[in-house]
């Protein structure tokens, strides 16, 4: 006995489903969950770079500047920027022949 004969049977007009309990709440819930899962999977594949970059770097913020005078905030920003700026002399150019 094959699964094909239990679920669907070929007729002259095409394939016909033999399951008559499609109005069962469990079947409806499973269908909705399946459709939502498919939609979320497609969105994840389309926007995975944005989503995971947001999760990775969006939660990591600098220290709180609440209650710190503006002059100290500007000094901190300049220190952070100077730490990011790198002198080109530190790089070694490698040429492949």
UniProtKB/Swiss-Prot annotation:
UniProt lists the family membership as follows: Belongs to the influenza viruses matrix protein M2 family.
State where the protein is found.
Virion membrane; Host apical cell membrane
Q: Which gene encodes it?
A: M
- InterPro entries (UniProt xref): Flu_M2 (IPR002089)
Q: Name one GO molecular function term.
A: proton transmembrane transporter activity
Subunit comment for this entry? Homotetramer; composed of two disulfide-linked dimers held together by non-covalent interactions. May interact with matrix protein 1.
Any one Gene Ontology BP term? symbiont genome entry into host cell via pore formation in plasma membrane
Protein name listed in UniProt: Matrix protein 2
Q: Name one GO cellular component term.
A: host cell plasma membrane
This protein's species is Influenza A virus (strain A/Mallard/New York/6750/1978 H2N2)
Q: What is known of its domains?
A: Cytoplasmic tail plays an important role in virion assembly and morphogenesis.
């Amino acid at each position: 006995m094959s699964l094909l004969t239990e679920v669907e049977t070929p007729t002259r007009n095409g394939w016909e489903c033999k399951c008559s309990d499609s109005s069962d709440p469990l079947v409806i819930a499973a269908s909705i969950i399946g459709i939502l899962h498919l939609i979320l999977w497609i969105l994840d594949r389309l926007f995975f770079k944005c989503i995971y970059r947001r999760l990775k770097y969006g939660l990591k913020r600098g220290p709180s500047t609440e209650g710190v005078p503006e002059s100290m905030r500007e000094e901190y920003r300049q220190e952070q920027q100077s730490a990011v700026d790198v002198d080109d002399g530190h790089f070694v150019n490698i040429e492949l022949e």
